[in-house]
Design a protein with these regions (language model features):
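Heptad-repeat alpha-helical rod positions in long coiled-coil/spectrin-like domains
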Residues: 11, 15-18, 22, 54, ...
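Extended amphipathic alpha-helical interaction segments
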Residues: 66-146
Length: 182
């Protein structure tokens, strides 16, 4: 049965996005800590930030896979549903089932757009975070800390927008699951 598979994949994609949001939130304080450290402590912050970046990158790959799974299962579910509607001989049942299919497909499309939009915003933030990590790696000194401070506002803003997008995607998944179960 494809219905439980779709529900499970949507739930897993929602959980993955929530975890990803937390990872981005965790990376931000580490960036902010940079201005308060000197010398050897700077390398520790770099290593923590690098780990955060790598975690975020791995999670992005997992989210891509989850979205692909959701898309495939949804396509299979909708194709099966349409095929079964064509097998119905009762016109009233057929009409009702088509309406239900259309509503479910519309809710799924809203969910899918939200997931893809949130995922699309991850790469630019990851790229910026990677730039930051590499710059820090190559300039492990007090001068690097001073020049990175100017980027702080932009990175903080990018992460805030990304977290909001992920939260909207999670809300769309919750709404889809609630309607899907009804």
């Amino acid at each position: 049965e494809k219905r439980p598979l779709l529900r499970d994949q949507v739930e897993q994609a929602r959980e993955d996005q929530a975890e990803r949001s937390e990872e981005f939130k965790d990376a931000l304080p580490r960036i902010k800590e940079l201005t308060g450290f000197q010398g050897g402590e700077l390398e520790n912050v770099y290593l923590q930030l690098k780990d955060d970046y790598e975690d975020c990158e791995r999670r992005a790959a997992v989210i891509d896979e989850r979205i692909d799974n959701v898309e495939q299962i949804a396509a299979d579910l909708f194709a099966e549903w349409e095929s079964e509607i064509d097998q119905m001989t009762n016109p009233s049942f057929r009409t009702s089932s088509r309406q239900s299919l259309a509503r479910t497909r519309d809710r799924y499309n809203r969910l899918h757009r939200a997931m893809v939009q949130a995922r699309g915003r991850m790469d630019p933030v990851l790229s910026r975070l990677n730039d930051y990590v590499l710059y820090l790696k190559h300039n492990l000194n007090a001068q690097a800390v001073g020049s990175l401070g100017t980027e702080m506002g932009r990175i903080e803003s990018d992460i805030a927008v990304l977290v909001r997008d992920i939260e909207r995607s999670i809300e769309a998944a919750d709404a889809f699951l609630q309607d899907f179960e009804a």
